Amino acid sequence: MDLVDKRDVLIGDFRPSLGFYGGVRVGVYLDTTEPKHAKIKGFAMETLKRSSKVWLQELRSNLNIFWGTIESEISKNGAASYIFPLQRCIFSFLCASLAGVDASVSPDIAENGWKTINTWLALQVIPTAKLGVVPQPLEEILLHTWPYPSLLIAGNYKKLYNFIDENAGDCLRLGQEEFGLTRDEAIQNLLFVLGFNAYGGFSVFLPSLIGRITGDNSGLQERIRTEVRRVCGSGSDLNFKTVNEMELVKSVVYETLRFSPPVPLQFARARKDFQISSHDAVFEVKKGELLCGYQPLVMRDANVFDEPEEFKPDRYVGETGSELLNYLYWSNGPQTGTPSASNKQCAAKDIVTLTASLLVADLFLRYDTITGDSGSIKAVVKAK
């Protein structure tokens, strides 16, 4: 971190209005040299640590509801669009595990909270994101010309704020008493971690993962099913320890992150003049220049990855495969790195891959086969 500054560069040289966060500069917009950064990152990491007590239970409980919805839709319509049911599942799961709140204590939040976050996220990222819904010149004129005001979502965001304020007392006291945050700072940062980092990240990544598996016709499902059931024996044996023994499951998760990183662009500004080297060249970087890392390009480096344009499910299996984790940068750092209060690596780096692996293992304890793509599921065959 001595070479680059991460101040206000989450999505480049554009920062959404602080009105989206109640006027608070949340942790993601702080550089590591700013005093509040260590406190907020520490709060996020401790919140994740404490959530481990209920993480698996809440994940599987909400997956039960999700898959029940999907099965019902398939029986009625012959197929099920799963994006919105999955987002509702993710929201409910994260409220319970991160904030320690059952979303159902507020019927309005349980029904509409995830929709509010979708709008809140969209208003922040649309000014710089390529959507592809209209021809590019029109997209630039119509969508990328101005920032969107937080006023458009302020009322519904306030409902989420009040929901956390009224129900997440234990988590908020952690931020206040152990990390010296004001209650408002704790609420705004918890909402950002829950809504932007976790919910937003999972909403992008998990459909890619599910789509890879459900759309595969190479025999991958049979291989995963065999591994999961060999390790688990029965559904009651799925836990953090057993899922870590599933080399193929974890490799599929890593390979999906390599192909489809949830945050494809990462930015930083040079603190000083320095040189940056590639395999065959050296580039001069001047102080103050904004640097952009395009992850899909970085993680398809032919000097590192064999056949980088091919999706290889078992790429990370074995000792040789595990060495490639040094070059898996989806989390703003290598998969072998360690998030800390002094760096900007994703605090949930390990819990993201663990959660995705648990989802895959849970899927193949429920079903023998599943057919679909990144947006819909067409058929499931229940485990015999």
Swiss-Prot record:
Keyword Membrane part of the UniProt annotation: no
Gene name tied to this protein: CYP74B2
User: Record's family?
Assistant: Belongs to the cytochrome P450 family.
In which tissues or organs does this protein occur? Expressed in roots, leaves, flowers and siliques.
Q: Which PANTHER family match?
A: CYTOCHROME P450 26 (PTHR24286), INACTIVE LINOLENATE HYDROPEROXIDE LYASE-RELATED (PTHR24286:SF49)
Induction pattern? By wounding.
Keywords of the record: Heme, Iron, Metal-binding
What the entry lists under InterPro entries is as follows: Cyt_P450 (IPR001128), Cyt_P450_E_grp-IV (IPR002403), Cyt_P450_sf (IPR036396)
Q: Which SUPFAM superfamilies match?
A: Cytochrome P450
Q: Name one GO biological process term.
A: response to wounding
What's a Gene Ontology MF term here? Answer: heme binding
What is this protein's name?
Probable inactive linolenate hydroperoxide lyase
Q: Which domain of life is it from?
A: Eukaryota
Its cellular-component GO annotations read:
chloroplast envelope
Lineage start: Eukaryota, Viridiplantae, Streptophyta, Embryophyta, Tracheophyta
Q: Where does heme bind?
A: C346
User: What are the names of the required cofactors?
Assistant: heme
